[in-house]
């Protein structure tokens, strides 16, 4: 979650622009629920019992101390904001992350995508808006090591310690249909595509499709 706060100033800048909203513009805050998926790259990581602890290994070799790396998936939570400067043109920012950690061989990981976009809305009417998004951002994979520590046999705690991160630049594009269900409240099914050069270091492809449903509130007249 700390990574989200790093980009809080950008969302604050959008918030400061709310007073400028009028009948030809508007400001949205939204939250998304969805998933992003890509396969495993087929590599492995040695366990602490391996002759090469936490080193790269081949699961196909049949070594019981070599754990395969996973595919990317699971639940993603999103936070975003959009500012429509004109009826058909605007800017926005999004961050999508896994709220909980998942296993990555003997490690754990949490994935984050963030992007800053230009928005083109060829359809922008009272009850519906078609959004076409395109921009740049980053992808961050944070790794940690979980360990159980016990005092005697009565008290045990699960300790998770960060062991590193992998950061990549990304290109982002997306399309969504924003449906206003009650005055300023909306629902937006959205499909996103992230192209992350170097992402094959962690997963099986540099191409990451994502599907989400966003809900939010819009300031400004519809």
Predicted regions and their residues:
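Surface-exposed strand-loop-strand hairpins of Gram-negative outer-membrane beta-barrel proteins
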Residues: 36-77, 166
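Gram-negative (and chloroplast) outer-membrane scaffold detector with strong preference
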Residues: 24-26, 33-39, 75-157, 168-171, ...
């Amino acid at each position: 979650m700390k990574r989200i706060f790093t980009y809080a100033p950008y969302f604050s800048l959008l918030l400061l622009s709310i007073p400028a909203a009028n009948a030809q513009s508007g400001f949205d805050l939204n939250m998304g629920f969805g998933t992003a998926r890509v396969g495993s790259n087929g590599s492995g990581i040695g366990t602490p019992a391996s002759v090469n602890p936490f080193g790269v290994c081949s699961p196909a070799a049949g070594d019981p101390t070599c754990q395969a790396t996973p595919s990317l998936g699971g639940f993603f939570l999103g936070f975003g904001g959009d500012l429509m400067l004109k009826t058909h043109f605007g800017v926005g920012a999004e961050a999508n992350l896994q709220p909980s950690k998942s296993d990555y061989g003997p490690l754990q990981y949490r994935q984050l995508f963030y992007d800053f976009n230009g928005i083109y809305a060829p359809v922008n009417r009272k009850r519906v808006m078609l959004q076409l998004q395109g921009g740049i951002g980053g992808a961050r994979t944070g790794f940690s090591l979980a360990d159980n520590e016990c005092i005697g046999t009565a008290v045990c705690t699960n300790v998770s310690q960060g062991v590193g991160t992998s950061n990549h630049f990304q290109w982002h594009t997306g399309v969504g249909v924003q449906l206003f269900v009650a005055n300023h409240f909306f629902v937006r099914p959205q499909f996103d595509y992230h192209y992350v050069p170097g992402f094959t270091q962690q997963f099986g492809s540099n191409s990451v499709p994502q599907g989400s449903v966003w809900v939010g509130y819009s300031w400004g007249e519809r």
